[in-house]
Amino acid sequence: MSLITDLPAIFDQFSEARQKGFLTVMDLKERGIPLVGTYCTFMPQEIPMAAGAVVVSLCSTADETIEEAEKDLPRNLCPLIKSSYGFGKTDKCPYFYFSDLVVGETTCDGKKKMYEYMAEFKPVHVMQLPNSVKDDASRALWKAEMLRLQKTVEERFGHEISEDALRDAIALKNRERRALANFYHLGQLNPPPLSGSDILKVVYGATFRFDKEALINELDAMTARVRQQWEEGQRLDPRPRILITGCPIGGAAEKVVRAIEENGGWVVGYENCTGAKATEQCVAETGDVYDALADKYLAIGCSCVSPNDQRLQMLSQMVEEYQVDGVVDVILQACHTYAVESLAIKRHVRQQHNIPYIAIETDYSTSDVGQLSTRVAAFIEML
């Protein structure tokens, strides 16, 4: 695809990628290409990719199916879990409907129990994530889980995964990570060249671009164009620079970003799952492939592991590189691990970097938009 001269039009294309991807998925199914659905960045996409499958992020960012989910699940459960289950149960997510296999993971107790019910209407493989990532036993367990996933994928799709195919998938996925990282590193420029809303459109929309080569080329061209325009003086006005951390990006993050940027701030970076957490580190392309995969995915700084030094290290790196003025921690209601860890994040940000921090607990509804705007406006005014 040739680069459109109007950059906002490109950002909107990425924003619409999820809806447009529905037709692409139907075409993939008609061509007999397997589809693997996933909910988490801990899932090693390289393994199903090596079997010729396409990996898709499943719909779990809106509240429209939560009422149906609550017929089976507790009301006081994380909205991400209820939304994930609801979209699957109601067949309102075409990506879930067309998935031949869903790969889950034990990142939290609510999720792993939800997968038991999901398995009643969709083939589900659950990866057992170790609670700690600091010892050899945890690494051995996670490597074994990689091999168990390989076996499941091979049996499910009747396609043996060769080492060469896996190395090719690793190399391709690494190129995608680097292209995404180069794009969101644009937020390090000061003043920023684009808004956090536009960054979010591209980073989230990229998960629904299934032609990896085309995606990489488009990201590279767009990044070069934005950087060139910034060097020519096309920059946003100086404002307080905000880093978002916390729960996975989705409907909740979108309204938080909107509140920040409508009240005088710019979101310049995302530490969340769809942002730096997933793409900043690549898989080693030498040595044992499963050791390399285990090492990369165990390095993800998620609140479900303890201790979670990786998250603190990533935050410190981003606070410095993005010249951050304040940190906003987005916590989904009833997400206990991120809620409990918020104290450690607050201490780290304030004591190690001497910058303001605010924790925002929210869900996928719009009921708190007014209150959210008021709190965010007061926070930014303080900056």
Q: What role is predicted for each listed range?
A:
Residues 76-92, 303-317:
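Glycine-rich, highly charged phosphate/nucleotide-binding loops
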Residues 85-152:
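Acidic/His-rich segments in extracytoplasmic proteins that coordinate ligands and/or metal ions
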Residues 8-9, 15-29, 33, 37-41, ...:
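Metallocofactor- and cofactor-centric catalytic cores in central/energy metabolism, strongly enriched
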Residues 3, 343-383:
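Peripheral docking tails and interdomain loops at the edges
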Residues 306-352:
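C-terminal hydrophobic structural anchor segments
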Residues 47-61, 68-69, 243, 247-320:
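Redox- and metal-dependent alpha/beta enzyme cores, enriched for Fe-S-associated oxidoreductases
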Residues 2-34, 147, 151-279:
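A charged, amphipathic alpha-helical module
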Residues 35, 100-101, 326:
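Structural motif
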